[in-house]
């Protein structure tokens, strides 16, 4: 909720529903067997997010505003998960199929960490990371850098000699495309895309590529 450029952005309306509801709906489709968790700060200002999370069927985990790594570690512990998929709340156009590629790469590679952001080739707003609970616990115990506590995974991907990692890349580099929500301009574009494509259900990258080519 504490965005400086677009305050309360996860509550912004897209097609009659808050941004967070879209994110949770799409995250749920990544893996039907996974437990959906909404890990949010304990601050009273974040209380409105609880109702949205419960409506989506998410387990609610609350903790520190700044120590996001601790929130993720507590989520893993409370759900007894062997790995955690990290999706942020500012990605209402997330493509579950793209995220599933990252999960599949993790599962088939005997890895501690996998992502599609090192380096990025998918649009900004499709960022997906998966971390083993063992690696997450190590980061939680050992990380002292505030940046590593806030951004969850840097302790892991900064240490390739210690943690086994892999990146999932697309055949075409679309990392310059902004499909994330950080500014009022982002919100306007996302609303336009949603309006154009919502009849297709949970549309993804293929539909957005097709729309952009049609407009071009």
Question: Language-model features: where?
Answer:
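Acidic helix N-cap motif at the loop->helix transition within catalytic regions
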Residues: 45-52
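N-terminal glycine-rich phosphate-binding loop and ensuing alpha1 helix
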Residues: 1-40
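Conserved alpha/beta core of the MobA/IspD/sugar-nucleotide pyrophosphorylase nucleotidyltransferase superfamily
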Residues: 131, 150-216
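Conserved donor-nucleotide/metal-binding helix-loop-beta segment in metal-dependent transferases, i.e.
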Residues: 95-121
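Conserved donor nucleotide-binding strand/loop of the catalytic core
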Residues: 54-67
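Short aromatic/hydrophobic "clamp" motif used to bind/position activated sugar donors
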Residues: 84-85
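Conserved nucleotide-sugar donor-binding
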Residues: 81, 128-140, 184-186
């Amino acid at each position: 909720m504490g965005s400086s450029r677009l305050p309360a952005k996860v509550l912004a309306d897209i097609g009659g529903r808050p941004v967070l509801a879209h994110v949770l709906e799409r995250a749920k489709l990544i893996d039907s067997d996974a437990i959906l968790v909404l890990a949010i700060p304990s601050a009273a200002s974040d209380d409105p997010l609880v109702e949205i999370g419960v409506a989506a069927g998410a387990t609610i985990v609350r903790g520190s505003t700044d120590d996001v790594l601790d929130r993720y570690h507590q989520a893993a512990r409370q759900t007894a998960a062997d790995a955690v998929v990290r999706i942020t709340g500012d990605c209402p156009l997330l493509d579950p199929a793209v995220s599933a590629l990252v999960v599949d790469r993790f599962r088939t590679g005997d890895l501690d960490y996998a992502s599609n952001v090192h380096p990025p080739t998918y649009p900004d707003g499709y960022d997906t990371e998966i971390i083993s609970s063992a690696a997450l616990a190590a980061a939680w115990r050992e990380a002292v850098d505030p940046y590593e506590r806030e951004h969850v995974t840097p302790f892991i991907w900064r240490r390739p000699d210690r943690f086994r990692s892999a990146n999932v890349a697309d055949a075409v580099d679309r990392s310059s495309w902004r499909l994330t929500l950080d500014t009022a301009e982002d919100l306007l574009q996302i609303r336009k895309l949603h309006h154009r494509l919502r009849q297709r259900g949970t549309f993804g990258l293929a539909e957005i590529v097709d729309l952009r080519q049609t407009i071009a």
